[in-house]
């Protein structure tokens, strides 16, 4: 279709009937800030694809501009020009934001002088070729307007001669011609802006401090309610798991206030954290308690509310000064350290009425069960994603930036020290720090390095360039640390600092809410440490609207951990990780944003592809973490329901027949027994059906287990009522063939004794297995797990098929789900016209070492059209080409499946049905000379989504 028809069809869908063509990419859309979509995302999408842009926004702030800085930088590098018009209306637009825009060579900025009439425009126009996209409505270029506010905007598509577009551009050009060049008015406007801001500050200083008590936030309220319930039921221990910055210390203070102990002990691992905890408790309790400190420097043994470091308290001559039941209530902070002997000694000695443990990350790689220490009583669990959704944290703008190439080599795990501290790299770090900026009057940054020597040299280099900095390590005294933090955070301090360099002493516990920029100039060690370091900037603070996180990404082998950490997805599913890298900015809650430059994305994709998650050591670690949390042996469903590693990784491992096999290898406490025949039965289901890509086989098995029989009609009814699948008798018949081993000759060979049914009745063998409780438990677990996978991952089927758009399928999956009577996957390579279907499998990036005659030029022409080559030695009159050409007459359904490269494994993304419209006879080179081949162009029924298109096209 041409663009004019696309726009007309889009208008019909938008204004006549929404079901007309809902996949049309040109339809007018209503844009607001909702879960999974922000106005910001639409603007970013258009900026990334445009040839030119025009923006008119009454108000522009640094907060609104910062999440777009990566996009503007890439536009500058590509030479894409834009015009941005703003105003001095209400003196609201931030001069710092205007200066930032002014620093970009490709953007021209003007300021309209508001005199009599207000200036309220909020419009964004993007041109790509002869197509224009406009977004007009209520959203200014401010952070909240683009991310969380209730805003109403309309997005429309127009050709150059469209009336609405011409009126809009005409108005923009008129205002532009009347506006002032920014350099002519910015100095005067900045003075006006600053004087107004100072007046506002002055008014705030005259306000009296509120005398109201502190009010618990949503996390703290839920935690206190859970804790009360545990205490009332007679429990004496509990664990609080909550993301860094959500207010764990205050939560514990409110809980202790609720309990009202006579004597109380708070245990931490650093004196500085103990002092911060005392301040928090004083804010809650006011002057009603006697607070004391027990550290190397203070010995307030007699205080009723005692805050102690573990180093001091664990000394034999210190803790024995107290009776075992001295304290009614004990809080242990950063309790994931409790596996250490010093913590064990304290926990074994004291006998409080109640003990509360607090941590952001209870999982430990050394096998210590933190949950067991607290009787598996999880009072509250708030991870990063939950905390962002609840608005408990300061919004962050994360930028994944490619680290510098030094002497033609990219920084990696083996880069020599002198290259890490070279002049070029120092200048690069400072350049990026300045460009991406910060919220507030001056920069207050933490820089995490990989080693002390690097931190020292970088700090010296920063100081030499006029950026005051200092290094803090575990070797520094408590007073040195406190002095450095004061110089960094206090605007009245002499010898103010801009940067503190460190390796790991700020990973946890220390509260520096003023931090407005975090630089990560080291490889990611683990998702936990990544979140701990990112979390240093996430505490809310007055006049801090957001924190900037700059992650300098080299060719590190652990780069795959970055999307795992940011998403909180612990499934270790490679497709989930890739998906977050593509779409993370669209799904991250609240006003936060995530951006990667193209090189960084490629490096992370390479890391994902080159890393094996099918490691038994990883399986055991994740299994133990979940076992500790639950206090029992977890089943497959437990992994899924607790958001842990996807157990399909275990089931698909070549060394595992089924989950039972894994339990026997991984857990010495597991003493149940299954026969070889029972294991074989579980293996068939685990390897072939547990993925949940079709529910039919699983429902038949479930019916056999509970009823002893099934009928086609009963399964058809179940599919209709529980899964909204209509009129699918063919798939039911296909599922019966699969379970009877008629679908696959290989299955018949591998499972010669396997039998689930006799006609529509349960087989005697299956009935006998089910009498064994262990077998029954395992088979129901794998069936229910598969059905849950289907509901959550594969139920959005398209066009009446058993296939879900953008889900991934193997060739065997496709044969089964297209209801082919036999598994032809072993001979199904590029495509096959069979059973009135034609699946096409494309590997987008082909290996260099394949033969010339198979180097097919398969590629997207655009998001709607795919250009594909048949196998060689075919002509326009060849049988299969004619079959494809006559698809309408024969009702042939053509399905397109694509994977980026062989590094992704055996599965392909399903791109939906396609229709051929152009056939060209051409040739392809081979060792025997040019061979005939046919190039066919296909229209996609549903245009490929932007993220996947960019992924295939190497735009990332």
Residue ranges and their predicted role:
Residues 275, 293, 298-299, 318, ...:
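Conserved helicase ATPase core of P-loop NTP-dependent helicases/translocases
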Residues 378-446:
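Conserved interdomain linker/interface between the two RecA-like ATPase lobes of SF2 helicase motors
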Residues 1-217, 221:
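PLD/PLD-like phosphodiesterase catalytic module centered on the HKD motif
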Residues 337-397:
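Post-DEXD/H (motif II) to motif III coupling segment of the RecA-like Helicase ATP-binding lobe
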Residues 527-532, 536-566:
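Conserved segment of the helicase C-terminal RecA-like domain
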Residues 191, 195-218, 227, 434-435, ...:
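Long, largely alpha-helical accessory region at the distal end of helicase-like NTP-driven motors
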Residues 231-256, 270:
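Walker A/P-loop
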Residues 679-689, 694-698, 705, 800-907:
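Acidic, glycine-rich low-complexity segments with interspersed aromatic residues
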